[in-house]
Amino acid sequence: LLTDIDRWNESDEAVTLMTIHSAKGLEFPIVMIVGLEEGLFPLGPQSYEVEELEEERRLFYVAVTRAQQKVYLSYANSRRRFGGHPMPAVQSRFIHELPEELVSVKTGIKAAETAPSLSILR
């Protein structure tokens, strides 16, 4: 049984979407990690158990270290869940744990319409 990652070719100039689990052991020039909000990453109340939270922190480390040159982190200011009304989103605690000297905050062209994005410089 082949997966998309089994057919991945490093020389292809294309965006590759994958889970963090399937990215283990691979590296890419640029990595984009989306959904870095409390309740998504880390997942939620079950992640407040020390062991589960540490596992999610390790997964975040895996995701960040897949980047050879740059990593872009993004989060939403608000999110609609299960067809409901937009709810305010809180930036993931993992972003705040990164060394400040490695983080550069960038905002979109129209800050009111786009959420801030972060870049980790290597």
What are these regions (language model features)?
Residues 98-122:
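Acidic, low-complexity intrinsically disordered tails
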Residues 1-102:
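Conserved helicase C-terminal RecA-like lobe
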